[in-house]
Each structure stands twice: as structure tokens, then as C-alpha cells.
Amino acid sequence: MRIKINFKGSNTAYENNNLKQVKGWFEDNAIGRHNDMHDKFSNYSLSPMMGGKRNGKYISYPDGGYVYFTTMDIELINMVSNNLFCNCKGSKVGDLEYKWFESVPDFHIHSDFDLVRTMSPVLMRMKDKSYMTVKDEKFIDELLSRSKRKLIKVGLNENKVNTLNMSMFHPENASTVNMQYNGIPNIGSKVMLVVTGDKHVRETLYSMGLGMSTGCGFGTVTVNE
């Protein structure tokens, strides 16, 4: 299930990204700051602010911006929808004022495989504080392993989860991205993937996002029609 959260336009220019501001607004107005769904594991994906126009290292949203919220958790989507309806009038992310939210079509899951593209970088921090990126030979192995652990954690059948597989699509176009979050430098990966396996498993994975910190704007994906 997917929600598109729309914001009115502003000519204010923002430097780099506004991941922290989006997350803060979402916690204050839609999901609450005091729950167990933040930080280490989120069963949802919250995208960065999209719809902007970039000029060098700055980005502005003269025509408005939008954020995607995606989850397979019905209770969570209902809670967020109710809070957006009741609590958000006049609230802002920076100078971008909340406008409305709308349900959008779920991911189109194909019968055999999906072509999946990252809308925001996939983040995988290792125990030694280094980052696993598309430049690493074991990137896919690590991403697949983490994805399976997340899927099992939300209650999916382990045998069905183990049907999941993924490979790079046009790896020559994959890239790394340096992004700061709350003053902390992070290195993420932009990539296209071929994903196979049980259809419900695939859909659940996309709804949670890829990698870590999917509730902070990382790892948001889209599926090619």
C-alpha cells in the first residue's frame, strides 16, 4: 500500500538533501516519535522529498514536492492516513506546506521477475562502520542477505523468502552517492536490479525498501511497468 504526500511549492533553495527534515515532519505529524519502528528496522519505506529542480548543489520545489510512504502493514497505513487527515494542516517541511495525501497504485509485480530502480540510495553500513556499495564485489550477496532477514522478521514464510534472488541490471550504470544525514556522511548506492522469487515476497520487500534506514529516506524503489 502506497501513499503520496503532497506539499505546496516554494522557491526556497535547499542544499544537498532534506532527509532529516522530512523524517522529523513525518514523525511529528504522521507516525509519532515514540515508537519501536525507527532507526535499526522499519517495516515501511519513506522517500526523500521529490519533485524538485536542481541547480548545482541546491534544489528547490517551485511546483511543489511530494513524499512516498509505503508499507504492507494495514494498521500502520490506517494510522498514518488518519494522522495525515487530522493533524497536518498548516504543517511544513522547511517552507513546503502540507497540501494533501492520496492513495496511489501498488507496485506492479510481474509474474517472473521485476526490474527495480532505486529512487534514493541504498545504504548498507557494516559493523566496522564502513559502507558496502556497488563498488564491492559482495554488494548483491550482502543486499540479498539483509533483505531476507528483514522479510523473515516481518513474519514471511522462510521457504518462500528463500526463493528471492537478485542481480545487477546494467551494472555499468550503477553509482555511489555521498549523502549527509544529521551531519553524518553516508555512502549509498544507486542501482537497477533484476529481482525474482515469490510475488508476495517481492512486493513486501519493495514496500519496506532496500538496505537500512528506509524510514529515513534511503532505499526507496520503483518497479518498471
Language model features: what each stretch is:
Residues M1-E225:
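RNA-interacting cores
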